């Protein structure tokens, strides 16, 4: 198992290129199951979750060819089975995204429940209700979702009680081959969903209301779609993370290959804290702040402040003057990084879903443990400003969603080494 060793308080300067968005790539990879013709997907990030989804597609019978490290050609013309097994699904919760396309195209599928998933307690029930609204029969048998619609799916209204990004994506993909019109009410509005809509539209699916909370889909009454090649949008969370690298180290950094309006909640907050930003068409440059002020954040669905940036801003709060407050409204157990930041010297108190951070605090290098993907990046941010050497363990979480993070940070002047645990 690998860990990162980070020398703190090293000056940073330069630019970084943002990779394709993992959270856009995953549903688009799943959507290729709807296509009867070959599709080329460009700007795929080389991260563990993408490799896991590619392996799942291959296991279902899709033929895959990597044309270069970030371009994949996929043909799902002759899939030979429709069972997504536990061995593959347990590696990644987003594997549930194959449910909608498999059911829509083949009228029956078996998809393992994602690991540790209790029906009712986790959002998987939103996916199942959406499929049932389109006429599917759903049974849970021996840890598998058995879904079937012998006469095909039929368009209907799908109302999400709670906004769900992957739930919206699964419903969109299923509706694309359903007979008639489907309305998704209380749909998620993330840019990743907008790109999935564009991909489905390239195959002839009519979708109204793209980017809004109500989507109207007229299904294509064929056995499959003819999807076109696509380039994955830049990763707004990776971009936000590198903006935080600049912010926490108070460095001048340029973040390239981005879509600035996808980052507005993040850039607005950085300006409020005291940073100057030069926002161009596809880049943002962050300049050192004379004074970094404490702030308040409440996580919300897009276009609100993203829950996936909450951990990074908690690390940043340790270097801001005054008391910062972060309220997490979307997920439980999303403050697991707080106790690890405390090991570095952060002054953080927790009360249910609210974290209070007192700053500015001098952090000291230590051994810390990543608990999830975004927590791992928060610990790296804190280690960059800590006095001495820090070691971040369990970075397999990091590798799920950040492409070559240590290479990109080292190119800015940092001293980060990937080493093997003894």
From Swiss-Prot:
A cellular component term, taken from the record's GO annotations: cytoplasm
Catalytic activity: phosphoenolpyruvate + UDP-N-acetyl-alpha-D-glucosamine = UDP-N-acetyl-3-O-(1-carboxyvinyl)-alpha-D-glucosamine + phosphate
Pathway the protein contributes to: Cell wall biogenesis; peptidoglycan biosynthesis
Binding positions (phosphoenolpyruvate): 22-23
Primary location recorded for the protein, binned into one broad class: cytoplasm
Residues with the 2-(S-cysteinyl)pyruvic acid O-phosphothioketal modification: 117
EC number(s) given by UniProt: 2.5.1.7
Pfam families listed in its UniProt record: EPSP_synthase
SUPFAM superfamilies hit by this protein: EPT/RTPC-like
UniProt entry keywords in alphabetical sequence: Cell cycle, Cell division, Cell shape, Cell wall biogenesis/degradation, Cytoplasm, Peptidoglycan synthesis, Pyruvate, Transferase
Biological-process GO terms, alphabetical: cell division; cell wall organization; peptidoglycan biosynthetic process; regulation of cell shape; UDP-N-acetylgalactosamine biosynthetic process
Active-site residues (renumbered): 117
GO molecular function (one): UDP-N-acetylglucosamine 1-carboxyvinyltransferase activity
InterPro entries (UniProt xref): Enolpyruvate_Tfrase_dom (IPR001986), Enolpyruvate_Tfrase_sf (IPR036968), MurA_subfamily (IPR050068), RNA3'P_cycl/enolpyr_Trfase_a/b (IPR013792), UDP_GlcNAc_COvinyl_MurA (IPR005750)
Gene3D superfamilies: Enolpyruvate transferase domain
Family of this protein: Belongs to the EPSP synthase family. MurA subfamily.
Function: Cell wall formation. Adds enolpyruvyl to UDP-N-acetylglucosamine.
NCBIfam families (UniProt xref): murA, PRK09369.1
Record HAMAP family: MurA (MF_00111)
Protein name: UDP-N-acetylglucosamine 1-carboxyvinyltransferase
């Amino acid at each position: 198992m690998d860990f990162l060793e980070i020398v703190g308080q090293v000056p940073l300067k330069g630019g970084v290129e943002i990779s394709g968005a993992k959270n856009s790539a995953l549903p688009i990879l799943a959507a290729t199951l709807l296509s009867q013709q070959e599709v080329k997907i460009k700007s795929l990030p080389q991260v563990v979750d993408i490799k896991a989804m590619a392996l799942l597609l291959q296991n279902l019978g899709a033929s895959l060819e990597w044309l270069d490290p970030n371009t994949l050609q996929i043909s799902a013309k002759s899939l030979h089975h429709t069972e997504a097994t536990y061995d593959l699904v347990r590696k990644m919760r987003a594997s549930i995204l194959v449910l909608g396309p498999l059911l829509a195209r083949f009228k029956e599928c078996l998809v393992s429940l994602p690991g540790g998933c209790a029906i009712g307690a986790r959002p998987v029930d939103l996916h199942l209700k959406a499929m049932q609204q389109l006429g599917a029969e759903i049974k849970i048998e021996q840890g598998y979702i058995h879904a079937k619609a012998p006469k095909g799916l039929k368009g209907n209204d799908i109302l999400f009680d709670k906004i769900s990004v992957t739930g919206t994506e699964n419903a969109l993909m299923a509706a694309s081959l359903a007979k008639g019109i489907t309305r998704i009410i209380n749909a998620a509005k993330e840019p990743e969903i907008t790109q999935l809509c564009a991909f489905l539209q390239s195959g002839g699916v009519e979708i109204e209301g793209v980017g809004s909370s109500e989507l109207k889909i007229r299904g294509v009454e064929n056995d499959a779609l003819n999807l076109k090649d696509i380039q994955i949008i830049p990763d707004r969370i990776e971009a936000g993370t590198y903006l935080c690298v600049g912010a926490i180290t108070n460095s001048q950094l340029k973040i390239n290959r981005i879509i600035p309006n996808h980052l507005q909640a993040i850039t607005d907050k950085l300006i409020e804290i005291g940073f100057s930003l030069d926002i161009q068409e596809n880049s943002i440059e962050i300049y050192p702040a004379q004074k970094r002020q404490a702030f308040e954040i409440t996580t919300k669905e897009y276009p609100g402040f993203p829950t996936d940036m909450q951990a990074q801003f908690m690390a940043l709060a340790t270097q801001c003057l005054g008391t910062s407050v972060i309220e997490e409204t979307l997920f439980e157990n999303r403050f697991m990084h707080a106790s690890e930041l405390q090991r570095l010297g952060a002054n953080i108190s927790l009360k249910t879903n609210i974290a209070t951070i007192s700053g500015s605090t001098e952090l000291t290098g230590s051994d810390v443990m990543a608990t999830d993907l975004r927590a791992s990046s928060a610990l790296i941010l804190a280690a960059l400003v800590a006095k001495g050497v820090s070691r971040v363990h369990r970075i397999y979480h990091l590798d799920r969603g950040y492409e070559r993070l240590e290479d990109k940070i080292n190119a800015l002047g940092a001293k980060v080494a990937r080493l093997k645990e003894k």
